[in-house]
Amino acid sequence: MANTKGGLVVSKQEMTKMWIDDKFVAVTLVKLLPQEIVRFKTNEKDGYVSAVVGVEKKELNKDKGQKVDYSMVTEFLVDENFLSAHQAGEVLDTNLFDGVSTISVTGQSKGKGFQGMVKRCNIKGWSATHGHKFTRSGGSKGNRKPRRTMKGHPHAGHMGSEQKTIKRIPLLKVLEREGEKLMVVKGSLPGARNSKLKFFVE
């Protein structure tokens, strides 16, 4: 079931470690980006309910007829309670995650280019000795019958640069550093540094 409690757009910063419960825990720091609710989509007009969020509003010259623009416009599925509690033009903040212990994260994974089967599909490979020349090759693609390559067979190809969603990630704390709000989550997150991620309330 999709999350319908809203969310935030953040920027991935760095990984570090924190001392939690008498042990070091690997954590990821993400920075809250300035964002506001542009408008709402409703069942009557659009067939579903969501909040359209604009991230990093750009300063444009209205005298030249330039319209409002954002570096990113996305939307979050919301419920009727979210509609009644928020309005268009409202700036979203980390208080949306007050009392929330776990979140879902969606982002673009790092692109790794064209990779072979050993790295892309995690196959073992072949013997490195006894005169074998094809240690990291794919080998046979199938049997004499059914005379075709079966679906799901590992092959070399493009790896990474895919949308990934990770659920039930522990949200540890919210910090403020140099006027910026940082959120600390346990473990690693998809994407490169400074890439945008979507945090969903679970």
Report residues per predicted region.
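Extended basic (Lys/Arg/His-rich) segments that typically form rRNA-contacting surfaces
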Residues: M1-E202
